[in-house]
Amino acid sequence: MARFLHLADIHLGFDRYNSPERTKDFFFALSDVIQKYAIATKVDFVIIAGDLFEHRVIQPAILNQAQLCFQQLQAAHIPVLAIEGNHDNTPYGTSTSWLKYLSQWGMLKLLEPGNIAAGEPLYAPWDEVNKKGGYIDLACGVRVVGSAWYGAAAVRAIGQIAEAVKALPTGPDTTVLLFHHGLEGQIARYSGALRYSELMPLKEAGVDYLALGHIHKNYCEGGWIFNPGSLEANNVEEGGFTRGAYLVEVDAEGIHADLKQDYCQRPVVRLLAKTQDSDSEADVVAKARQAVEVAIATGQLVPEQQSIVELRIEGQVGFARLELDTKQLQKDLQALSQALIFLLKYEVEEKEFAEPIASEASRDLIERSAFKDMLTAHRDYKKRADTLSEGLIDLKHKRLSGQDDEALYHYLEELLV
């Protein structure tokens, strides 16, 4: 029996929120998964199906994080087999990458197809001396085959890979192929995903376990296609995805993949506050605070965990939406929730009011109607819209007649009493 751990989309060095603590979360997740589901379970090997790193160019501290994790596996004599993803593939015009660096130093084995244009076979066996190869036959009875990041050329590459896998020498009974691409229908707003039928040549070529990466959501199809999802959430939406690492066992009865999710992850909490057209700025602030306070009271949000929190405020308001100081509100709510990152999504609409106006209406009537519509839409002025709109017309005439500013201010004070 063989046992292995399938990881993908680790994204060490994630820095989207400009938070050093959030960047460390991705390291802590990987380290914990390795301890719990690779070392403690004594797997035969670990596979990484792309995007170990968030960026092609990484900082020394991020490289050190990867080395610390892989040194744990080295000490346990567990090999790591990896491929490049779209985030960490070899930059155009160069011949090296940080994954190749780790491979050359024996931290992992980067399984890459050969350069056919240079006369190399698509798949050569792993050469431990030169730290190079496209596939490896392991003593546990599994053949692991690598691939590259193909992007839009994935369908064409699948045909080439399938033919090359068929032509490989006879080897272990089980073949695992690492492939960084997504399957159609698994996630919205993702173009270029592969159809199931387009992957079938790999199954027909003898691939028993297609280890996917790229989409950050867990899925499996047909009993042979497996995608664990990312270890950590890359955005608040992914906080609600089923994600993790596959602990896989291969025995005489077949393949058994168990998704593991119990490891170090920072909680992501999404909240909603609904407004109505009669709400003032103070009302909106109170509703926002209430949404956070209720989440704390019900245990949805635990301040001590320093979660990532998103509060979406939506609906209509009875004031100009830009009058609300959202920066101060975000700061206050972050302090209240003790969130590491607090994202305030202020997506309200101002109440609109418009009286029908005849096409032949005079300019004076149009102006009066515009003032009245604006005042009617404001919660503080709508009951006096008729009086105030007349006052604004008078104010315009007074300005045009040349009255000074002091007189105009005095007129406004009396109008608003």
Where are these regions (language model features)?
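N-terminal active-site segment of His-dependent metallophosphoesterases
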Residues: 1-69, 75
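Accessory, non-catalytic peripheral segments of nucleic-acid enzymes
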Residues: 255-417
